[in-house]
Amino acid sequence: RIFPINILENDQFQSDFLKISPNNKIPAIVDQDGPRGEAISVFESGAILQYLGRKTGLFYPTDEQKRVEVEQWLMWQMGGLGPMLGQNHHFGKFAKEQIPYAIERFTAETKRLYKVLDQQLIGQDYVAGEYSIADIAILPWLLRHELQNIAIDDYPNVKNYIERLSARPAVQRALAIQV
């Protein structure tokens, strides 16, 4: 089941949610069928993806070399793409005052990260070879490229990647969820 957390209404600060996600951030899950048959709460998108990948055996290779490749792109998203694009979006759209330095800095870093990804995708469909939890983590940020002042046509491999991932039936089902 999906329980929407409305961050504009400060739902993330409710005590029940803080028991699941002490960092008061989304996403967070509760797996009623966790390890040893006990419920487990998992917060942070990367941790959730790794947990579900290990549990299901899907989209998270067991071969150590392939797993490291997936993990480094997952960490790239968590430590670079997500935070920088989030700051780009914040300073470009939501900041109470326009701060040119912040806008320029995060726009430049966003473009640099798109270029890194565009280069990585030369000759391959997914960031780590096969579809993985890294791709699952990256896509939501790319879907907001227009809000990040990104001309997606400047990054043809990223544009094709977005189209390829968005065409996956499971991705279409996820994007159709209204919360």
Say what each PLM segment does:
Residues 158-179:
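Long hydrophobic alpha-helical segments typical of transmembrane helices together
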Residues 53-54, 122, 166-167:
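Residues at helix-coil transition
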Residues 100-107, 125, 148-151:
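Active-site rim elements
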Residues 6, 133, 178:
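Short, solvent-exposed turn/loop segments enriched in Gly/Ser/Thr/Pro and often Arg
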Residues 80, 85-89, 126-154, 159-165:
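GST superfamily/GST-like fold recognition
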Residues 53, 141-142, 175:
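Active-site-flanking alpha-helical
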Residues 1-104, 108-111, 118:
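GST-like domain detector, emphasizing the conserved glutathione-binding G-site
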